[in-house]
């Protein structure tokens, strides 16, 4: 068997199947970084703060999108 056939990725049949275990959420993803990012939805922390207006966000990509509006 070729290594690429066992590779865990978008085209593999052996993908990870990660499901959020928070309450009854059940969001599923195949990438660890996606589930890690998703878990921030359930936590009240907002560590990413806008330097222009002070608005805070849970995820860096949300702050980045917000800053484009300034």
Swiss-Prot record:
GO terms for cellular component: nucleus. InterPro entries: pacC/RIM101 (IPR050806), Znf_C2H2_sf (IPR036236), Znf_C2H2_type (IPR013087). Keywords: Activator, DNA-binding, Metal-binding, Nucleus, Repeat, Repressor, Transcription, Transcription regulation, Zinc, Zinc-finger. Its main location: nucleus. GO terms for biological process: positive regulation of transcription by RNA polymerase II. PROSITE patterns: ZINC_FINGER_C2H2_1 (PS00028), ZINC_FINGER_C2H2_2 (PS50157). It is found in: Nucleus. The keyword Repeat applies. A zinc finger (C2H2-type) spans 18-42, 48-70. The keyword Transcription applies. Pfam families: zf-C2H2 (PF00096). GO terms for molecular function: DNA binding; zinc ion binding. It comes from the Eukaryota. Belongs to the pacC/RIM101 family. Transcription factor that mediates regulation of both acid- and alkaline-expressed genes in response to ambient pH. At alkaline ambient pH, activates transcription of alkaline-expressed genes (including pacC itself) and represses transcription of acid-expressed genes. This is pH-response transcription factor pacC/RIM101.
